[in-house]
C-alpha cells in the first residue's frame, strides 16, 4: 500500500521506496491571428459542454514538442498553417490533470478553414472589434482572446473596468 510522501506531492511504497508522481497531461491552446482578425471556434455539443467561442487546443502527444502540437492541432481542426508561435503563459486546470500552455501564433498562408466536423461545430475569423468581452476571466483562453482584442490585459482592465480576481 502506497503512502503519502512527507516531502513532496507523491506516493511512496514504504517497502521498496518506489515513488509515484501525479499524472499531468500537457495541452496547448493557441490564439491564431491574421492581422486584426482572430480565429475562434465552437465545440460540438456532444464533445464539450462549453458553448462560447473557443480557441484551438489539444493534448500534447508523446515525443511531441508544444510547437509540433500546435501545428498538428491547427491542421487537424481547421486545416490551416501557422507561424511565429510565441509562448504566453500556462495554467493548471483544477478539474483535471491538465496543464494548459498558451501561445499566440500567426496565420501562414491562405485563410480558408477546413473544419474538423466531428470535434467543432463552427470556426471563423473575427475582427478584434467583433470579439465579445469575457464576462469571467477564469481561463487562459479568455485571457488570450482579451489580450488580442485589447493589446494587453492591462488595457482590457482599463477599458472594461473588470477587476482581476487573482
Predicted feature descriptions by range:
Residues 18, 40, 97-98, 154-155:
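Short amphipathic alpha-helical patches
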Residues 3, 48-52, 117-166:
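Nudix hydrolase/Nudix homology domain
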Residues 6, 23, 81-83, 89, ...:
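Context-gated lysine
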Residues 58-144:
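Unchanged
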Residues 1-3, 20:
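Cys/His-rich microdomains that often coordinate metals
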Amino acid at each position: 500500500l502506497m503512502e503519502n510522501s512527507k516531502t513532496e506531492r507523491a506516493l511512496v511504497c514504504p517497502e521498496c521506496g518506489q515513488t509515484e508522481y501525479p499524472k499531468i497531461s500537457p495541452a496547448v491552446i493557441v490564439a491564431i491571428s491574421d492581422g486584426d482578425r482572430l480565429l475562434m471556434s465552437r465545440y460540438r455539443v456532444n464533445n464539450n459542454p462549453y458553448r462560447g467561442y473557443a480557441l484551438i487546443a489539444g493534448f500534447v502527444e508523446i515525443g511531441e514538442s508544444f510547437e509540433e502540437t500546435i501545428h498538428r492541432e491547427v491542421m487537424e481542426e481547421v486545416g490551416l498553417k501557422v507561424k511565429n508561435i510565441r509562448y504566453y503563459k500556462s495554467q493548471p486546470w483544477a478539474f483535471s490533470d491538465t496543464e494548459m500552455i498558451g501561445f499566440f501564433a500567426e496565420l501562414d498562408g491562405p485563410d480558408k478553414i477546413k473544419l474538423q466536423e466531428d470535434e467543432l461545430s463552427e470556426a471563423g475569423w473575427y475582427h478584434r472589434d467583433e470579439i465579445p468581452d469575457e464576462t469571467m476571466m477564469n481561463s487562459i483562453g479568455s485571457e488570450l482572446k482579451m489580450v488580442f482584442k485589447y493589446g494587453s490585459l492591462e488595457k482590457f482592465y482599463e477599458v472594461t473596468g473588470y477587476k482581476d480576481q487573482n
